[in-house]
Curated annotation (Swiss-Prot):
This is Serine hydroxymethyltransferase. It comes from the Bacteria. One of its GO terms (biological process) is tetrahydrofolate interconversion. It catalyses: (6R)-5,10-methylene-5,6,7,8-tetrahydrofolate + glycine + H2O = (6S)-5,6,7,8-tetrahydrofolate + L-serine. Belongs to the SHMT family. The record marks H235 as: Plays an important role in substrate specificity. Keywords: Amino-acid biosynthesis, Cytoplasm, One-carbon metabolism, Pyridoxal phosphate, Transferase. Its cofactor is pyridoxal 5'-phosphate. (6S)-5,6,7,8-tetrahydrofolate binds at L127, G131, H132, L133. Its EC number is 2.1.2.1. It is found in: Cytoplasm. The modification N6-(pyridoxal phosphate)lysine is found at K236.
């Protein structure tokens, strides 16, 4: 049998085997270089993470856990997973860690499976008030398999009112209380959540997917002393590969391991786990902590500049809660003729990437929304200064006011090209 044709496909580079996909990679690299990435859930991973994720570990199947696999030949990938586990435990001071979840949503599903029974009552922040799909949204597994009740933000302050959370918990007696968010710009009171959970006999699960990097840097309260289980993604503020992990008190370790495998997944992605290990090592560095500090300061700079722009206020556009304590800014358009989708598209037109986002008590549908979410992590990773973030905020304001869009695009491109990303990177 002549294997020559396949052998060529096996050893040839991507541009030879599949030029169409090679072109997609080139186009995306160009987009990332020339746009100002301000989606709060995105970041740029270090080149070392790209290398780990694109490694020969892709080839290895490893169902089970280190030193207890269902396949042979796992002695090398065991080393990678053991490193990832020990590093993330040390990083956050946790008794237990599982680094196998393919995503944050998978980690969340496993957390619920480990903590409670199908059909039981769970309680989390409502989606359009800043929660996440997996915290009880009706179309999600969390809303289909569990009886979900949701707490809302105070209509005046747009903050979580812990007295209201307590009243809701006493009324519904959930088995799991969820503290966490995808769009909330202030700190959570984990001690108060713990007190409420204890009062009603609930488990406390914290989803720190968005703020894990801030916790690692000591710039956001740690949920570890208070929560029974903590879930997170490894991207966003952690700037690692796309994936998830679970931290917990030791007593929940066995249930979580079973919930992840075989409960939610089969074989883990060992190349991604190796990349997670790299991310956890980087996150323990002083340079990472400094970057997180700048990330928050940059978000505050953007919030202040946009919030103080009288031209936007005259159009009914403001900053939700008047500022931020985290890596994101929520631009509130509920009183404006402009909607979130229009704002997102205008910013994309000038080379700034954001996402539209529902606001508390939003009257517009989710595909339109009354706000946009702006994040600073990716641009801080690129090296922008606070003065440059001030200019970026001015670009955003002018774009939302439709003032000389070609000029705003030129300004954004100049800033982007001042801070090149992945210089000299060979993708194939």
């Amino acid at each position: 049998m002549n294997h020559g044709v396949y052998q060529n496909l096996f050893i040839d580079s991507l541009d030879s085997v599949d030029p169409q996909i090679a072109e997609v990679l080139d186009l995306e690299l160009r987009r990332q270089r020339d746009f100002l990435e301000m989606i709060a859930s995105e970041n740029f991973v270090p080149r070392a993470i790209l290398q780990a994720q694109g490694s020969v570990l892709t080839n290895k199947y490893a169902e089970g856990y280190p030193q207890n696999r269902y396949y042979g030949g796992c002695e090398c990938v065991d080393l990678a997973e053991d490193l990832a586990i020990s590093r993330v435990r040390d990083l956050f001071g946790s008794e237990f860690a599982n680094v196998q979840p393919h995503s944050g949503s998978t980690a969340n599903a496993a957390a619920l499976m480990a903590l409670t029974e199908v059909g039981s009552t769970i309680m989390g922040l409502e989606l359009d008030h800043g929660g996440h799909l997996t915290h009880g949204m009706p179309l999600s597994f969390s809303g289909k398999h569990y009886k979900a009740v949701t707490y809302r933000l105070d209509p005046k302050t747009c903050l979580i009112d812990m007295d209201s959370v307590r009243d809701l918990a006493l009324r519904h007696r959930p088995s799991v209380i969820i503290a966490g968010w995808s769009a909330y710009v202030r700190h959570l009171d984990f001690e108060a959540f713990r007190s409420i959970a204890d009062e009603v006999g609930a488990r406390l699960w914290v989803d720190m997917a968005h703020f894990a990097g801030l916790v690692a840097a000591g710039l956001y309260p740690s949920p570890i002393p208070w929560a029974d289980v903590v879930t997170s993604t490894t991207h966003k503020t952690l700037a690692g590969p796309r994936g998830g992990f679970i931290l917990a008190k030791k007593e929940f370790g066995k249930a979580i391991n079973t919930a992840v495998f075989p409960g939610q997944q089969g074989g883990p992605l060992m190349h991604v786990i190796a990349a997670k290990a790299v991310a956890f090592k980087v996150a323990a560095s002083e340079g990472f902590r400094e970057r997180q500090r700048i990330t928050i300061e940059a978000a505050r700079t953007v919030a202040k500049r946009i919030g103080e722009d009288y031209r936007l206020r005259d159009r009914g556009i403001d900053i939700l809660t008047g500022g931020t304590d985290v890596h994101m800014v929520l631009v509130d358009m509920r009183k404006s003729d402009m909607d979130g989708l229009t704002g997102q598209n205008l910013l994309h037109e000038v080379g700034v990437t954001v996402n539209r986002n529902s606001m508390p008590y939003d009257k517009r549908p989710p595909r339109i929304t009354s706000g946009i979410r702006i994040g600073t992590p990716a641009l801080v990773t690129r090296g922008l200064s606070l003065d440059e973030f001030d200019e970026v905020a001015d670009i955003i304001s002018n774009a939302l006011l439709t003032i000389d869009l070609p000029k705003q695009k030129q300004r954004a491109l100049r800033i982007a090209r001042t801070h090149p990303v992945y210089e000299g990177l060979r993708q194939y």
